[in-house]
Amino acid sequence: EVGSLSVSLNTMLTRIEESFHAQAETTEKMKQFVSDASHELRTPLAAIHGYAELYKMQRDMPGALERADESIEHIEASSARMTVLVEDLLSLARLDEGRGIDITQQVPLTSVVRDAADDLHALDPDRGIRCGLIAIKPGTDLEHPSDFTFQDGDMPAITLTGDASRLRQVVTNIVGNIHRYTPADSPVEISMGVLPASISPESLSRMPANERSMHHLVEAIEVGQSMQVGMNYAIVRFSDHGPGVPPEARSKIFERFYTADPSRARQKGGTGLGMAIAQSVVKAHHGFICASGSEGGGLTLTVVLPVAPVEPRPAPEAETRKADKKGRKTKK
């Protein structure tokens, strides 16, 4: 009894300690988020203030009207950036609180992805965009494990339960980054499909956004395909062939305000919150999102969303019984 009590007490203390660590980590992240948000909001505010002061200083000088137009253009640009930033911050705050999302709608995912591909083509007419199917390429050895691969063909019609506007936001954010940070004539492959995986949505959504998790997912898909068990998942991949992101920084792109080049991100109109919002939305759907390298260079973003449980295969005995019953009825 004493030994059992000691084990229970140690277990309870371990859980309390883990809870304290988790709370401290959450508090630290919140402090960092507030600090980063304050810094990001200060930048456009400082620009607005600076150009307003410049206008006041120059309004009585010769050529003041032309310079005033220039100042107003800068003020408008900074104001627009601040508006986008505030909207993204509010969006994240609502998602953190579990508000602003309704995952009970029927979402035509294929239409959402096709619309995004059309939008990207309109933005970059010289860019080659291929849409196709997603499949698993079997591994050859330990150094070359199984992985996702692109196959030519029509994207399948996929409908799932979720929040249509939020999932559209995820896809739009990904395509927006491709437009901003890759050459306008570099090719893009967009593939999608439904694959079974022997992993629950709850476990999937808790996996860290790294390539080890991707390998774990591919293994779960191979088991799901061979055993016909688990959950069917809609998988969408966006592969660009731009400058890419170093392997050690790929998981960081989902951190709030993370940008590989902050000055370039501001020039391109990015807030550093797009991928953080995408991850929050995907996790709210009990899904998974991850960044990895594209074959031949570039960045690939993979979005995985649950569709429905896999229909189990009938047991051989059950099939035999059904056949026997059918035969008896026929004889009668």
Predicted regions, residues:
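Short helix N-cap motif at coil->helix boundaries in the Bergerat
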Residues: 109, 244-255
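Short alpha-helical segment of the dimerization/phosphotransfer core of two-component systems
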Residues: 21, 77-82
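Membrane-proximal coiled-coil signaling linkers
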Residues: 14-59, 71
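Short helix-loop "hinge" at the ATP-lid/N-box region of the Bergerat-fold HATPase_c
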Residues: 178-179
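Short beta-strand/loop element within the Bergerat-fold HATPase_c
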Residues: 185-199, 222-231
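Conserved micro-motifs of the catalytic ATP-binding
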Residues: 97-103, 142, 155-162
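Glycine-rich ATP-binding loops of the HATPase_c
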Residues: 286-292
